[in-house]
Amino acid sequence: MILLLLACKKDRFLNSSDARVRVSDDTLHFDTVFVTAGSTYRAFTVANDYDQKLLLTSVRLGGGNTSPFKLNLNGQIGYAFNSIVLDKKDSLYGWIQVNIDPNNQNTPFVVRDSVIIELNGKTQKIQLEAWGRNAYFLRNARISQSQTWSNDKPYVI
C-alpha cells in the first residue's frame, strides 16, 4: 500500500512568468497561392526545453475563425486550442494552410495573420504571410481553335 501512495504524484507545471517555449520559426511564408486553390502545409514546432511540464493557455490564430489560415495542431484542425500540456523536454507539431478568397486585384497581394502561443500570462507569435494571386482557372476546358487570352492575370490550366 505504501508503494502505491509514493508512486502517485501530482502533475506540476512550470508557472514562472519568465518561461518561454522554443518555436522552430518566427515567420511562415507562402509564395504565390492562387485564390480558392489552397496551399500546401507549412510545419512548425513548439518545444519545451524545461525539466518541468508546461501548460499552454492557448495556441490560436490571431484572426480567429475569420482567418484565411487554418491551424492543425497534433492532428486536430481548428482556429484555437486551449489548455495544452507540453511534457518536459517534449514538443508538439503544428501545420498551417492558407486558402485565399478572390478579390478584384490583378496584381499579387498579401494576407497576414499570426499563431499566438500563450503561456503563464505571456504571448509569443509566429507570423504568417501568404502572397495571393487571382487567376483564370481553366478546368476541363477544351481549346479547339486559336484564342487570344488577356494578360491581366495568370491562367491555371
Where are the model-predicted features located?
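Beta-strand-rich extracellular passenger or scaffold domains
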Residues: 155-157
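Buried hydrophobic-core signal for structured, non-transmembrane domains
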Residues: 41-49, 96, 111-118
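Terminal connector regions
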Residues: 9-12, 101-134
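A mature extracytoplasmic/lumenal domain signature
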Residues: 58-60, 98, 121, 132, ...
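Surface-exposed binding patches on compact interaction domains or structured appendages
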Residues: 9-32, 38-40, 49-97, 102
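Low-complexity, Pro/Ser/Thr- and charge-rich linker/hinge segments at domain boundaries
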Residues: 126-153
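C-terminal motif of bacterial Sec signal peptides marking the signal peptidase cleavage site
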Residues: 4-7
